[in-house]
Amino acid sequence: MGGKTVTRADLAEAVYRKVGLSRTESAQIVEMVLQEVCDAIVRGETVKLSSFATFQVREKNERVGRNPKTGEEVPISPRRVMTFKASNVLKSRILRAHQTRKPSKEATASS
């Protein structure tokens, strides 16, 4: 499952190759898009990228948790968390890609 990690530089290179802008312009566009997404999330806005995903900031109330070692109750402060929800289109693409992979050695050995 581990595969390659895609970086900002990889995204800029893809824009450069596919759109035909200079490498500098491509890197600037990637930076600007990521900055806009980050700024909107920091402002507490929901960012919905159609056919990709939704990023949303949620408020979590204060609650009581437990220390798993001791069982002692520990207060957990209220906080804001960001959630990422993949779109159905992205989920379908991931599922199709998974289904078209070669079967593993374990799967073929048990057949």
From Swiss-Prot:
GO biological process terms held by the UniProt record: DNA recombination; positive regulation of metabolic process; regulation of DNA-templated transcription; regulation of translation
Keyword terms of this UniProt record: DNA recombination, DNA-binding, Transcription, Transcription regulation, Translation regulation
Source organism superkingdom: Bacteria
GO terms assigned for molecular function: DNA binding; structural constituent of chromatin
Entries under SMART domains matching the protein: BHL (SM00411)
PROSITE patterns in the cross-refs: HISTONE_LIKE
CDD domains: IHF_A
GO cellular component, one term: cytosol
Role according to the record: This protein is one of the two subunits of integration host factor, a specific DNA-binding protein that functions in genetic recombination as well as in transcriptional and translational control.
Family classification: Belongs to the bacterial histone-like protein family.
HAMAP family reported for this sequence: IHF_alpha (MF_00380)
Protein name: Integration host factor subunit alpha
Species, as recorded: Chelativorans sp. (strain BNC1)
Phylogenetic lineage: Bacteria, Pseudomonadati, Pseudomonadota, Alphaproteobacteria, Hyphomicrobiales
